[in-house]
């Protein structure tokens, strides 16, 4: 479970990085002045990205519960369909917050969506791949390669 907190911290660091990129004008937004930029960040980007992070954490938590319940089951490979189904929840959330904020993020929609997708990859895919228990840790897409990469960096798996 400590590994999922590590992926959450990495995701929050990247979130803060995107926040700084927008604030400092490195990624230009069609907002004039510091006041308009601060208003856009506090009204649109920050709440929507926190919603995506929260929903992704909830989906990860549900997956951990499912994998824990089937940790020694011989047919745990059947539970991978739940993993895919739970992945759709954060992706649907990304679509929803993007549609709701489309008028606010006209020229930066690609950058905002990119930051959302990074959160889902870090928290959900990598987090569940390295933190699932029992036999479930071997059935997720790319989990063996991710676990090998993470352990080669020196993080114990």
Regions found by a protein language model. Give the residues of each.
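Hydrophobic alpha-helical transmembrane segments of integral membrane proteins
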Residues: 78-110
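Membrane-helix interfacial "entry" motifs
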Residues: 36, 40-45, 74-78, 104-112
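Alpha-helical membrane-associated segments of multi-pass integral membrane proteins
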Residues: 7-18, 101-157
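Alpha-helical transmembrane segments of integral membrane proteins
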Residues: 3-10, 47, 51, 81-85, ...
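Transmembrane alpha-helical segments in integral membrane proteins
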Residues: 55-73, 122-136
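Generic alpha-helical transmembrane segments
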Residues: 44-66, 88-93
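N-terminal signal-anchor transmembrane alpha-helix
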Residues: 1-57
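Cytoplasmic juxtamembrane regions at transmembrane-helix boundaries
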Residues: 65-91, 143-157
């Amino acid at each position: 479970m400590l590994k999922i907190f590590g992926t959450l911290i990495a995701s929050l660091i990247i979130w803060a990085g995107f926040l700084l990129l927008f604030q400092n004008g490195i990624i230009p937004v069609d907002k004039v002045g510091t006041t308009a930029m601060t208003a856009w960040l506090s009204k649109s980007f920050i709440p929507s990205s926190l919603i995506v992070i929260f929903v992704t954490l909830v989906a990860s938590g549900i997956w951990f519960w499912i994998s824990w319940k089937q940790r020694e089951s011989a047919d745990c490979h059947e539970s991978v369909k739940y993993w895919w189904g739970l992945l759709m929840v954060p992706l649907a959330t990304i679509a929803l917050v993007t549609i709701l904020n489309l008028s606010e993020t006209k020229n930066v929609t690609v950058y905002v969506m990119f930051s959302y997708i990074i959160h889902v990859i870090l928290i959900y895919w990598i987090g569940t791949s390295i933190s699932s228990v029992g036999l479930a840790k071997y059935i997720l897409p790319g989990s063996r390669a991710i676990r090998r990469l993470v352990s080669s960096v020196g993080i114990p798996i």
